[in-house]
């Protein structure tokens, strides 16, 4: 039996079987393991496999990809597909898809019989509202008597408008008692709703996510917030009879409410005409079809009429059921459904008390007194109500917002802040000239990551409209885009120090991103397990960075001791390149040497505790490189005390195979340094004349001799003595002095000196390591100083310190700009301690350099040796 005959045979047998032919053009060949799928025939979408993506079903033609519609064959329970069309599709599919046909089993219908009529009606509402260029006609108007609609312009829904549209549709499905079918509705209407690029699963997630009583939208000025809201209100009022809405629009200014009412009324008049025309035309078409079959059509159609508001400002749209085409609405007709709209300014408390609404648009929410919510919230508890809050950002003319929508995030609330920007688009927004484009279009919700890192919503406006003078009006400034980094609170991947050069107002720019923070806390490394599974999973080198705070001493009872806070971080690296924190310390030396007050000994104890514990726990790491930052602390003494403790560790534990290294700076000896300075200074006044050395004035090139009044040479006694001394000191020739300096002794000093590249290292760490998920902590994070005293987890404590690190811009009196890294400002002229964050960042930044270190004329690595006699320091 041929393929066509087989399909026709089976297709004529049952009502619960359909055939779907694989669309190789889009998805490729289906695997052998995928032979059947369950799908909902009402929308024509399968459940388990994206390969089977298109179905023509019982009564809804849901082509999701019309280009390949002939590749799909389906026979519904009422046999609605014409025979000729079936044969044509079968032939096309057999030739195009190499006879690959798969049988799909499905239920006959997924919608309750009592709700099929409502579903048809609601889908018709979506079709009418989304077609006919209504968004363009109702929003893109020119406010002048002689200008028509701007029909030549193309309308694009902004991301917030797309979300607002879906939000209203989901709310109306609930009002029409179809909330349980919202996934079905959105999937069926995906093309006209702009959801073509999304899978059925994702569309279902959108439907569930928007099932909230409250939604909040924070939108830049002049982006179509109010006009689009008015458009959606008018569409629902005129084309959704089953909703039975009582809609309220409220704002803080009377002219806004007046304009909204006028706009909605004008839109409703145009929409009702279209609604009545389409419904009557469909009714007549069905009547004629039934007449051709010599049957009587017993259906009906809706016809709408509106009543303008009077004193109470209510606009009423009434819907009447008619079974006769062309009939006019009479005053005696009883409406089958009514939609009402009111636009009321909120001037004082209790303005909205007593009324009942089930769809509320609260415009410019940031400017309204918060008492309004006490009046509106109770309405959300009944009758499947919905409240949509929209607002622009506060500007600099207002001290603070009345309502911070950002803080209303809760289970029953959906928020959409349009300024949400993903990291990949962050830099492109900053670099462009026009700061008005603040929306990232990579996501339908425009919110892959959050903007507004801890600041109030009112600061967002200032981020893009910086005032150079506080007394001036808010205007766009050339520096507006530069402040975006500090307001969005995220670190774009690949950002370098050069990207922020030239930017002003970089205040408290947070460096950590939400993606990096999530990875840091949720993807902790089980180092022991990883080493058991793969012994070479980690490098054998651990780098410890010591950030000793410049010593601050305090005197109590005639005893002086160090009160500074010091920090250490121990970092290892996986062979995959990811960095793992094995241990952290944050301590004061007084805590460990309360009697002797020996700060160096206390610091050495903490260092050796980290080394010993990490070596014993993992039995893998055998090279520890200590990087102590050079400042006023006596690091040589710390190194000496580490040698004493190493002797004890070697004698009592198995530490023979452990190497502890530290960088040291190589400098000239004291004699060599002084000699070089003397050589450079005196070279200016020494010259060789015929093999002898004489003193001459370097300016006049004359002998420095003084004369008496009678012309005789008179060398003063003190000058004579000084010249004699100078001649004695310069008895060495130039070549002899140069040779002596070249072969003078070297001086070695323990420590690492940061060469002014701190900002660059921090930007590189957060941009290319932390925010790219290459930095995490060990599950067994060790800390001798913090382990027993911390109220929160050590990893969270370290993350808190990293969160507090910010980039700051300082401009001196001369206008010279400089960038610095510090802890976030807590109080006036005070900053959060950043020592632990600095140690973690620097340990990671320097890891590869010192692990693969090669000696240079300025720096070397020296190995710690056990010290057996306290009298000698090696």
Curated annotation (Swiss-Prot):
Membrane spanning stretches: none
Intrachain S-S bonds: none
UniProt GO BP: chromosome organization
A Pfam family matched in the record: DNA_pack_N
Protein name listed in UniProt: Uncharacterized protein ORF109
Provenance organism: Ostreid herpesvirus 1 (isolate France)
């Amino acid at each position: 039996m041929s393929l066509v005959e087989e399909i026709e045979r089976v297709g004529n047998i049952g009502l619960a079987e359909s055939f779907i032919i694989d669309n190789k053009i889009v998805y490729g060949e289906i695997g052998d393991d995928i032979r059947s799928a369950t799908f909902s025939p009402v929308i024509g979408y399968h459940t388990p496999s994206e390969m089977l993506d298109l179905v023509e079903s019982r009564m809804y033609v849901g082509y999701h990809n019309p280009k390949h519609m002939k590749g799909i064959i389906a026979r519904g329970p009422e046999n609605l597909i014409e025979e000729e069309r079936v044969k044509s599709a079968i032939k096309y599919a057999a030739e195009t898809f190499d006879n690959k046909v798969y049988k799909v089993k499905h239920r006959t219908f997924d919608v309750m019989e009592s709700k099929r009529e409502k579903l048809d009606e609601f889908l018709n509402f979506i079709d009418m509202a989304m077609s006919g260029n209504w968004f363009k006609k109702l929003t893109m108007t020119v406010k002048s008597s002689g200008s028509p609609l701007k029909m030549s312009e193309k309308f694009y829904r902004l991301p917030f408008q797309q979300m607002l549209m879906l939000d209203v549709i989901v709310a109306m499905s609930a009002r029409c008692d179809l909330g349980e079918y919202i996934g079905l509705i959105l999937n069926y209407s995906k093309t006209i709703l702009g959801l073509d690029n999304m899978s059925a699963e994702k569309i279902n997630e959108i439907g569930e996510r928007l099932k909230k009583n409250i939604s909040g939208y924070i939108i830049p000025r002049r982006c179509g917030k109010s006009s689009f809201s008015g458009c959606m209100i008018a569409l629902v009022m005129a084309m959704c009879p089953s909703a039975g809405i009582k809609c309220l629009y409220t704002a803080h200014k009377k002219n806004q409410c007046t304009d909204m009412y006028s706009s909605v009324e004008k839109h409703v008049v145009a929409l009702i005409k279209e609604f009545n025309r389409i419904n009557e035309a469909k009714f007549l078409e069905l009547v004629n079809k039934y007449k051709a079959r010599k049957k009587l059509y017993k259906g009906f159609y809706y016809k709408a009429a509106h009543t303008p508001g009077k004193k109470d400002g209510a606009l009423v749209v009434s819907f009447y059921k008619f079974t006769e085409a062309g009939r006019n609405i009479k005053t005696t007709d009883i409406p089958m459904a009514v939609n009402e709209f009111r636009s009321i300014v909120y001037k004082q408390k209790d303005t909205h008390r007593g009324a009942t609404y089930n769809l509320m648009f609260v415009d410019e929410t940031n400017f309204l007194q918060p008492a309004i919510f006490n009046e509106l919230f109770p309405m959300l508890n009944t009758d499947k109500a919905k409240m949509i809050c929209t607002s622009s950002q506060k500007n600099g003319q207002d001290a603070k917002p009345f309502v911070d929508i950002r803080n209303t995030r809760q289970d029953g609330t959906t928020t959409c802040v349009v300024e949400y920007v993903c990291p990949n688009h962050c830099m492109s927004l900053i670099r462009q000239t026009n700061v008005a484009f603040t929306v990232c279009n990579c996501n339908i919700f425009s919110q892959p990551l959050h903007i507004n890192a801890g600041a109030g919503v009112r600061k967002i406006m200032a981020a893009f409209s910086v005032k150079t003078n506080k007394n001036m009006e808010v205007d766009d400034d050339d520096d507006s885009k530069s402040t975006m980094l500090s307001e969005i609170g995220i670190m774009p991947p690949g950002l370098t120090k050069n990207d922020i050069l030239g930017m002003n107002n970089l205040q408290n720019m947070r460096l950590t991103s939400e993606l990096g923070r999530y990875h840091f806390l949720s993807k902790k490394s089980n180092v022991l397990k990883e080493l058991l599974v793969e012994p070479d999973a980690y490098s054998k080198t651990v780098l410890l960075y010591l950030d000793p705070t410049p010593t601050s001493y305090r005197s109590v009872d005639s005893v002086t001791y160090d009160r500074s806070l010091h920090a250490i971080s121990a970092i290892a690296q996986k062979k995959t390149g990811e960095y793992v924190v094995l241990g952290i310390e944050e301590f004061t030396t007084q805590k460990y040497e309360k009697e002797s007050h020996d700060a160096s000994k206390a610091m050495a104890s903490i260092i050796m505790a980290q080394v010993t514990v990490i070596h014993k726990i993992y039995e893998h790491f055998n090279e520890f490189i200590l990087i102590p930052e050079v400042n006023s602390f006596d690091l040589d003494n710390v190194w000496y005390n580490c040698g004493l403790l190493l002797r004890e560790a070697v004698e009592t534990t198995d530490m023979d195979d452990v190497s502890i290294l530290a960088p040291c700076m190589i400098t000239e000896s004291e004699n060599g340094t002084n000699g070089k300075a003397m050589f450079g200074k005196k070279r200016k006044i020494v010259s060789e004349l015929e093999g002898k050395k004489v003193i001459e004035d370097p300016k006049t090139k004359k002998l420095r001799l003084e004369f008496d009044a009678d012309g005789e040479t008179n060398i003063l006694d003190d000058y004579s003595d000084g010249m004699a001394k100078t001649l004695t000191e310069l008895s060495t020739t130039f070549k002899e002095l140069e040779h002596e300096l070249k072969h003078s002794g070297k001086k070695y000093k323990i420590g690492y000196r940061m060469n002014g590249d701190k900002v660059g290292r921090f930007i590189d760490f957060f941009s290319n390591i932390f925010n790219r998920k290459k930095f995490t902590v060990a599950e067994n994070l060790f800390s001798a100083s913090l382990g027993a005293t911390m109220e929160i987890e050590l990893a969270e404590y370290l993350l808190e310190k990293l969160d507090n690190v910010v980039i700051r811009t300082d401009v001196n009196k001369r206008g010279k700009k400089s960038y610095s890294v510090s802890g976030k400002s807590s109080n006036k002229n005070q900053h959060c301690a950043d020592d632990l964050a600095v140690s973690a960042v620097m340990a990671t930044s320097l890891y590869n350099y010192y692990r693969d270190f090669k000696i240079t004329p300025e720096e070397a690595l020296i190995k710690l040796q056990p010290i057996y006699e306290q009298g000698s320091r090696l």
